[in-house]
Amino acid sequence: METKNAKAIARKVSIAPRKARLVVDLIRGKNIAQAQAILTFTPKVAAPVILKLLNSAVSNAVNNLKLNREQLYVKEVFVNEGFRLKRMFPRAKGSGDMIKKRTSHITLVITSSTNLQTSKEEEQSGSKN
């Protein structure tokens, strides 16, 4: 049986990937209720963006794939580096330093815990043969 995964991607988010990864690491592997509670009370700039992305992925799972909301958990979540905006910061004697304003691409995949159980059962039955 093929597992059903719901996916949501936020591209060109104006948060540095290093800062976004701190928040993303908190919710990896958690169920949806725990992840939403963690993101609600995390005092980081990336937390509201990732919470919005999580809610979008949950909506995709419930509406498009007809999965049960209570059985969903975060299967994988990762942050890739987006493009960099290069800006000049004026320095002495007419020179300037480069400022790199970094952006992120955040990908979140959720699945149902029943999918996990069935895939484990298939692996066990396949290994016996």
From Swiss-Prot:
Keywords: Ribonucleoprotein, Ribosomal protein, RNA-binding, rRNA-binding. This protein binds specifically to 23S rRNA; its binding is stimulated by other ribosomal proteins, e.g. L4, L17, and L20. It is important during the early stages of 50S assembly. It makes multiple contacts with different domains of the 23S rRNA in the assembled 50S subunit and ribosome. The globular domain of the protein is located near the polypeptide exit tunnel on the outside of the subunit, while an extended beta-hairpin is found that lines the wall of the exit tunnel in the center of the 70S ribosome. GO terms for cellular component: cytosolic large ribosomal subunit. Belongs to the universal ribosomal protein uL22 family. This is Large ribosomal subunit protein uL22. The lineage of its organism: Bacteria, Bacillati, Mycoplasmatota, Mollicutes, Acholeplasmatales. Pfam families: Ribosomal_L22. GO terms for biological process: translation. Disulfide bonds: none annotated. One of its GO terms (molecular function) is structural constituent of ribosome. It comes from Aster yellows witches'-broom phytoplasma (strain AYWB). InterPro entries: Ribosomal_uL22, Ribosomal_uL22_bac/chlpt-type, Ribosomal_uL22_bac/org-type, Ribosomal_uL22_CS, Ribosomal_uL22_sf. Part of the 50S ribosomal subunit. The keyword NAD does not apply. Signal peptide: none annotated. It comes from the Bacteria. The gene is rplV.
